[in-house]
Amino acid sequence: MSATYPRFALVACVFLVLASTVAGRADDLTPRPTMGEILRLDAEADEILAKDATIEVLASGLDWSEGPVWIPGDARQPDGGGYVIFSDVPQNRVHRWKEGTGLSVFLTPSGYTGLPGYSKEAGSNGLALDRQGRIVFCEHGDRRVSVLTPGGGKRTLADNYQGRRFNSPNDCTIDAAGAIYFTDPPYGLPEGPQDKKFRELDWCGVYRIAPDGGVTLLTREMTFPNGIALAPDGRTLYVAQSDPAAAIWKAFPIQDDGTLGAGRVIADATAMVGRHRGLPDGLEVDVAGRLWATGPGGVHVMRPDGKLLARIDTRMACGNCCFGGDDGSWLYICSDAFLVRIQTKTRGWR
């Protein structure tokens, strides 16, 4: 989602990969600036966040940062990996931030390859890594889920449901078998939720792309499904709803055939809307199954049942987060025009 709104065909694309630094530090010799505060709301918070933890600012000057994913250092990455990438949705690009190097443009265009002026939110949004170490993109403008191929182009994984184009795929998560779960709100359409000209689906769905490419509509019951994540055992799917009137997170049991059982609301932040910046958006899950979910007032750290343990408040709207770093214990947060991070005492489960 963005701050503006409540907020297998081979496709030939040309991508420009730059080495320019954008408002990011290339050195690590002095302390980084910090922002916001950490609110500890349960004793368990001290088990996962050090008492002296701070929110470090890594980069600024972005438009609307989103969809971070950690690229591990391994032989599958042509450049060696060891960095975080994330989308700047309005700018239609993906940035890379690496320790000791700072911020650079990783890929552009990232989510829209048509004529200029289509949408204010045309770039890629959510990003993920598949089992082969390839980057999967949720693309607003091109209205598809795609994968970056070793040759540098993209291959479409899915761009329609029963012949009707998706709204604007927003965020995704991938299970152990390679199935991709993704959300499809309308934020990337030219008129956003009010779009009548380009919109082809009457709902905002949550979908599953099977390893063989088949697309299944899992649910259409959520008004604006947004962030999405899996529990460590792969049996529960968490979905955030970025609706100011019902700012909730739901948990769905995953059946043996990949479909969803009845969802239940595990947390409701509707009362915080308007008093704090942001709405339920991207989320991550740690090894203990706790949710680190962006929402009103920052990142809500919750138990699987929704019990709130802490809130990481950057004082800005937060769009998404991911675990990363060499041991997976840094939480990288996309917060409006900033990329920030906080050291935790846990790690992502992947």
What are these regions, as identified by a protein language model?
Residues 1-5:
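N-terminal secretory signal peptides that target proteins for export/translocation
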Residues 9-20:
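Bacterial N-terminal signal peptides
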Residues 24-350:
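Sequence-structural signature of mature extracellular/luminal beta-sheet repeat domains
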